[in-house]
Amino acid sequence: MLSIQVKDYMNHYPVTFTSEMVVEEAALRFLKTKQIGGPVIDGNNRVIGFLSESDVLATMLQTIYHNEHVSDVAALMRKEVLSVKPSDSVIELAKSMFQNKPKVYPVLDEDGILLG
């Protein structure tokens, strides 16, 4: 049976965020790209976290309600990132998606650099 790999179907231009980005800008990026999550990268394209649309919206609602300053992405991002390699099986990834909550998995090389 032919093995279908992640690299054959990954998005080569995923929506990304930086840790310094303000939450409002991240929310606009989610709206423009119609994505539900994306990796937070450093200046070397290394993944340092993950940001979900639901985390951004929940924070914005809370800060608006309490009339507080909205924080930056670094305060919201998840530091433990579930990721895949380009050579991973799409079938195995699909099984993981049924078992785990995330539906977006960054594709990383061996050095943690974002590929898709």
Regions found by a protein language model. Give the residues of each.
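Conserved glycine-centered beta-strand/turn positions repeated across beta-sheet architectures
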Residues: 48-49, 116
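The conserved cystathionine-beta-synthase
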Residues: 16-34, 41, 83-101, 107-110
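Tandem CBS (Bateman) regulatory domains
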Residues: 1-13, 52-102, 114
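Residues at secondary-structure transition points
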Residues: 43-44, 55
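A generic helix-loop boundary/linker signal
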Residues: 16, 20, 46, 66-67
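Short, conserved beta-strand segments within well-ordered enzyme catalytic domains
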Residues: 37-39, 50
